[in-house]
């Protein structure tokens, strides 16, 4: 599937809270559509598929990208599910979002793609760039870049800064001190179901 650009609240109603996709919460707590309030029992496959879709929509990655991350996670000696989440969380667009420089991951991706973000003194416009401990992330020293980030910081997507990051609001500079721990992943997800979903596909 390609990257989603449709109504975000519709997806949130179907899959539940997706902090990276939207700050808004739907007025109706049931899925959209004529049969949204039905209580049909879902199959195990449908449940695993839904967990996978949470990752796709929350992090704004394509199916092809997620498969690539899954293959990389499997090669790790760590838990496959936790490594998968780590790879997604340590993307530059998500890190910019978690630093509070953008209210959503799509907003953070736009900042990165348009060259407003600097990593270790150089402009990096690749949203999938994997941040590593020691990376210093700052805003390009241009009025419009700083103004955009300062405006975004007034409406942060998430209230708490993860403990693997630090951020100086005066200089608009953040630093990655470690890889993210599982308990700091904001998305409510059962990553083991995603691993099971791909077990016969990848």
Swiss-Prot record:
It comes from the Bacteria. SMART domains: Ribosomal_S4, S4. GO terms for biological process: ribosomal small subunit biogenesis; translation. One of its GO terms (cellular component) is small ribosomal subunit. Residues 90-152 form the S4 RNA-binding domain. GO terms for molecular function: rRNA binding; structural constituent of ribosome. Residues 16-43 are annotated as: Disordered. The lineage of its organism: Bacteria, Bacillati, Cyanobacteriota, Cyanophyceae, Oscillatoriophycideae. One of the primary rRNA binding proteins, it binds directly to 16S rRNA where it nucleates assembly of the body of the 30S subunit. It comes from Crocosphaera subtropica (strain ATCC 51142 / BH68) (Cyanothece sp. (strain ATCC 51142)). Belongs to the universal ribosomal protein uS4 family. Part of the 30S ribosomal subunit. Contacts protein S5. The interaction surface between S4 and S5 is involved in control of translational fidelity. Gene3D superfamilies: Ribosomal Protein S4 Delta 41, Chain A, domain 1, RNA-binding S4 domain. This is Small ribosomal subunit protein uS4. Keywords: Ribonucleoprotein, Ribosomal protein, RNA-binding, rRNA-binding.
